[in-house]
Swiss-Prot record:
GO molecular function: arginine binding; DNA binding; DNA-binding transcription factor activity
Role according to the record: Regulates arginine biosynthesis genes.
Gene: argR
Biological pathway: Amino-acid biosynthesis; L-arginine biosynthesis [regulation]
GO CC field: cytoplasm
Organism: Anaeromyxobacter sp. (strain Fw109-5)
Keyword set includes Amino-acid biosynthesis: yes
GO biological process: L-arginine biosynthetic process; protein complex oligomerization; regulation of arginine biosynthetic process
Protein name: Arginine repressor
Localization (cell): Cytoplasm
Sorted UniProt keywords: Amino-acid biosynthesis, Arginine biosynthesis, Cytoplasm, DNA-binding, Repressor, Transcription, Transcription regulation
Record PANTHER family: ARGININE REPRESSOR (PTHR34471:SF1)
Family per record: Belongs to the ArgR family.
Length: 158
């Protein structure tokens, strides 16, 4: 993973986990995590991630990522490595090219999808546990769309 990509993933993770109102606060959080960056670099990263400052009802502003930005960024780069997504009432199974499952599972985990409780990856298969009952089919369809893969029994993805 490139330094730029890693830094952007950390920035996205920080923005999802904390209420950060200024680039200086974000730079301090990055430095605390051992990542050095300039304000100009951080500004470009925020623009690339689609982050924007929004007003809070209780006053002040915070940086916020658009819905789905992280998942599209991280998962879209893995298109072509997934051969099929299937589900039953309680589990989603993703079949990948040999050796690809760990990277795809990590991208799913980092995407912070609210419908995903967690993942377990082998060499070419990922088990995805939905966060709630009756969400497996919906989650399978969403992951298949993000990964450019067919859902079992529905034909190729568009």
């Amino acid at each position: 993973m490139t330094h730029q990509r890693h830094r952007r993933e950390v920035v996205a993770r920080l923005l999802r986990a904390r209420r950060i109102g200024t680039q200086e606060e974000l730079l301090e959080a990055l430095r605390a995590g051992g990542i050095e960056a300039t304000q100009a670099t951080l500004s470009r990263d925020l623009a690339q991630l689609g982050a924007r400052r929004v007003s809070r009802p209780e006053g002040g502003t915070v940086y916020e990522l658009p819905a789905g930005a992280a998942e599209r960024d991280g998962l879209a780069t893995l298109r072509g490595l997934v051969s099929e997504v299937a589900s039953n009432a309680s589990l989603v199974v993703i079949r990948t090219h040999p050796g690809s499952a760990p990277a795809i599972a990590r991208a799913i985990d980092l995407a912070g999808l609210p419908d995903v409780l967690g993942t377990i990856a082998g060499d070419d298969t990922i088990f995805v546990a939905p966060a709630g009952e009756l969400r497996a089919r919906k989650l399978a369809t969403r992951l298949a769309d993000l990964l450019g893969a067919p859902v079992a029994g529905e034909g190729p993805a568009q």
